Amino acid sequence: MEKMMGVMLDCSRNAVMRVESVKKYAEIIKKMGYNTLMLYTEDTYEVNNQPLFGHLRGRYSKKELKEIDAYCNEIGIELVPCIQTLAHISSIFKWENVYDEVNDCDYILLVGEEKTYKLIEDMFSTISEVFTTRKIHIGMDEAYRVGQGKYEQLHGIRDRFDIINEHLHKVCEITEKYGMKPMIWNDMFVKFALDIKDQYADSDNSKIAEKASLPAGVSLVYWDYYSTDYERYAKMIETTKLFKREVYFAGGAWTWNGFAPDNDYSIKATKAAIEACNDCGVDGMFFTVWGDDGAECSKFAVLPALMYAAEKAKGNDDLNNIKAKFKTITGCKFDDFLLFDKLDTPGGKHRRSASKYIFYNDLFLGVRDCLCSENDGVYYANLEKELHNVCEKGSFELLFDTYEKFASLLKI
């Protein structure tokens, strides 16, 4: 069976992609060599018996998801749902009269509560109805304070690994009922099993063997987009394998710093990650396109990073060859897309979220003046010209035009 090679699109941060845009993305990544598209939807999909789940959030209807699924099947892409069944669903708790009883604390569901599992079953009944695949990502990442809110009041202080493992078993019983094969993010299980805050720190990994009682059918996804260190990736792959379950890797195509992408760093991190994945062995991989803080960056802006990842996974590290393939697929030059990165490199040096803090810097108060250079205006004027002079924009004329106008604004 062909291993998963996928892209995950974040459709939860106030920017649910239009059906036609998802189809276009699926077409592009299929040409690049990907076989899977994942839709990350925290509360942005219709759920049976839950009218307020995703209400006023631009959620996908069942009809829309069926349309996307049918199209992906037609072109040879497996559409996989990526949801949350423990944390990261803060928006539903705004409907206090409806969901307060299933809220532990923060954005975390209340483990052990019957109504929690009724909600989760409604999620699965919907998903099994609209998706062809039987694969599903059920989340469970970054539930840092699980068991420390309402759960603690009801049950007292307990080992948090035991809490999330019990929850995972209950959720997996539901996935089994619907014939689905679940995968989860690895971070909380590694941290709680080892009783550490930093999963990348040296630790006694033998503790995992004592707690490695995860459901038989679940897979673990090691996610990491923050390093260019091969050894770190290799270490964490081997650590995650100690749970004795299938292991997938999730890298990142950086779209979550603000308005500008970071293809350059994405490529460097991806190179190290894929080399570690190939050497250590994983059961599949995918690359996340997150939209933290309002999805200000276009998901199409990181197509160069995704092109590189697809080719690197095949063993191709010839950048000139990769650029030629990118041109064939998109009708645009690889290096022209990299101009978008330059919004965050005034003066030729990367400054994280530079375009964002310059844009929001109050002209009268100048709170961020200390982070700006007197030459930034000239830099952005030149970038505006570079973007304007791009001749081959393919079907991405609007994208180039948007960034050109943004550079024009930043030069002021």
Task: Describe the predicted segments one by one.
Residues 1-177, 183, 248-251, 256, ...:
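Feature activates predominantly on carbohydrate-active enzymes
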